[in-house]
Amino acid sequence: MGADRRRDPAVFTIPPEAPFLDSLAAGLWRDAKEDQAALARMTVVLPTRRAARGLAEAFLRLTEGRPLLLPRTIALAEAADEGVILAGLEAPPPAVGALRRQAALARLVLAKERAAGVASADHAFRLAGELATLLDEMAREEADPARLADAAEAAHAEHWLKTIAFLEIVTSHWPRWLADNGLADPAARLVALLESRRRHWERSPPESPVIAAGSTGGIPAVGRLLATVARLPAGAVVLPGLDLDMDAAAWEAIGESHPQAGLKRLLGRLGVAREEVRPWPGAGASGAFAARARVVSRMMLPAEGMGDWRRVEREAVRAGIAGLGRIDAADQNEEALVIALAMRAALETPGRRAALVTPDRALAARVSAALARFGIRADDSAGRPLGATPPGVYLRLLVTACAERLAPVPLLALLKHPLASGGMRPGRFRAAVRLFELALLRGQRPAPGIAGLEAAYAHAARLAREHRPRGLAAAARVIEALKRSLGPLLAALEVSEAPPARLLAATLAAAEALAATDTAPGARQLWAQEAGEAAAARMAEALEALEHMGPIPPESWPGLFEALFAGVEVRLRRIGSAGEGAPHPRLFIWGVLEARLQSAELVILGGLNEGTWPAAVDPGPWMSRPMRTRFGLASPEAAIGEAAHDVALALSSAPEMLLTRARRVDGAPTVPSRWLVRLDAFLESQLGPGDHLRPPADWLGIARALDAPDCVTPEPRAEPRPPLALRPKRLSVTEVERLLRDPFEIYAKHILGLRRLPELDEPIDRSDWGTVVHAAIASALRRMRKEGWPGVATFRHWIEEQGARSLEALAAPAREAFWRPRLARIAKWVAEAEERRLAEEGPVESFAEVKGELALPGGFVLHGRADRIDRLADGTLRLIDYKTGTIPPQKEIEEAYAIQLPLEAAMAERGAFAEVGRGIASHLAYWKLGGGFKPGAKTPVKGDAAALAAAAWERFEALRARFDDPSAAYWPRPHPHRAPQFSDYLHLARVEEWGGGDD
């Protein structure tokens, strides 16, 4: 590798079983004859910055920490950004920023879509991202746009003509835009930089050594540059993990998805036969690692080479899988915990490093969370998505809340975010928001916007009078803060169209205003720390980029704003952010790209499910696989081959390797990765059936035992026995029936004082429908008492009129549209029934919604409201209960379980209803008012009404006596078959637990 004016290509490989960067460092140090000055004169070209850092760390390991002058390193993949490859040369035009390009492309897409009548700004922005990807692919693969028309298959020619017409954006309009603005596409600029460097080195070969290491030459420009480096007087190319042992027939047969496919393609670009590639000096590995590499090589053989499976000795296979373990977890959480436990255990050995390699960012996040349980933060190469950081979440919540016009759920999500302070002390603002929620947002949704909140406040103030003044005062402060901070943005979203840059500026102003505290401006709060700095930089870039996009309808703004965060990661500094510890120096989480060329004593390959690793093959939205090939783009299967190479290298080189997957992801069953399936098949063919990849520790058992209790003692049924002084002395008729069926509910409601908190955005339900029907009929009956019978048509109109007012007050147009016809049918049925009753009985006194109250010995008060009581000609009473739901069975009435109506009759007998006067019931009836095909039905209660009333009163007195005994417990649901169908207190009584039901 010396500077001897050699022109034959110098191509080496470091075998897959050897740690690449450590072997590279050792070889360079040996070639420099351990002379630091000679080493410093070398230039090493590596694929990534992380690989460059890894090489520096490898040199430190080589010298056992002694300082060393290092060779100059160039990160090939980021050469355009760094501007180091072309040092001293004329540079091509600067690269257009990613956001600016997407915004400008979106404007072109919008113009196309508007011409077709299907314009959508957020869709156009995302489609612009797909076009940008296509542009970069075309640039990297050096595909000629003029060949687009030739790519179509005859069967799809008509469809392809439409696609070509749309792709004029990239073939015609976009090049003109770049030329007008003096810019270049990033990938095209990188290709130009690489090509300029190649030509420069060909014209003026450097005398100092140049080593290009670790690249598989994924794009033609890199391949040409490597070919030039290999022929420099002091140049060399070092390939990662070229399989020199595969026989020629198998080598010729490998396809795009094989691990060696990329290297085979690169050798063709280098003009070098595989037999000409030499092992990197000193890069041999121990027998155990070589055996592992042979196992992996045989496992990955194409079909034509599978005959070699039979030629592998069984003992060699056993040696090859030593240190290799596999775990199939039940789900993602269990997989993450298993990985975290294995990584934590690695720290028990001094100097031992552990790394998780996975393309699954959700799994990486779960592992980070599991490690945090042990007080550890791993060095995560991918960082954290900007949209998932505190400022990113806050900004997204703000846009959602404003786009949904301050609907309760998104509004509260925003107001409860730690960055929201509304110009107050943060703690005071949190307390005010909680009171604001209780006072105005629980229950039915207020009308939209600030005006809707103000109307809800005015309504609550009218109802409250002197009640809850503190809550209403806090609500007023929150509304004022919202008006001050979000008002301009809400106004900007009301126009028909607005420039997106103006909407972004209004969004950022609103975010800063709402983030302000009583002592600090919002900008200081929002843009602080690493995540805030990254968000500020992204928003500044977006402000400039969106100037190049035309006006959009405001309803597109949430989708467009969300797209601004796509693909942006925040990398935390190794020293740790505020509130977080520094990443552990021996624990790593690597993405697939970052893991290339890296090594650790324990490597865990996680997320090995088909569709995740490898990812599902996607040719993209523009062309089919054959069309891509004809056009000159890489086959989608090439990405699988690249991923297979990464897996093969990792499997071959780690002293200890753990392969993990989850059997179910998000509740759905998964399929093992094709590489796991191949490995299983290979091992079964060599060693027979069995569990051959047992990990060194039972990580699965440990993970499952970690949170398992020593023993499970079932909780007995609740048996609260409060003191008599705390037991309720006032119950409604409905509550008496509840006391009979579920005493615990009365205990929770009246003794503990617990009430169900209304839901946010609580939907209008059947209870509201029942209230509407009851109120409408009661109003008509009261009016009839004053004015007399008006006739069927008028009586029906009275019911419909009051019902319409009640429905309108619910402010639920969809429900109103459904219920109005039903109400009309009920009104007609009730009016006709009333006319028939008059014809049969003549006029009677009818009382509607009659309140009654009965004071009993011992200070107990029984109260209730009867739907309707008629005093008949003989002086007896008829009680009618309207039901829009289910009517109780006759058997339960006779057994005094359904006692509400008979108990009202007993109260009437005792003079509880002052408006009606004392009287004995002679008739009890239910009116089923559904409003459907059969609008109503009368169901008289069978049996003697007075006797049923007496039985109900006896049951009531027995209940009273029972719960006047201090030893009597308020059991939950003592008779399950008689229990209420619905209850707000089942979870408090833990019925499912002691009742044997599923949680």
Regions found by a protein language model. Give the residues of each.
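RecB-family 4Fe-4S metal-dependent nuclease core
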Residues: 519, 667, 711-999
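Polyanion-engaging groove/track-forming segments
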Residues: 1-787, 792, 800-813, 829, ...
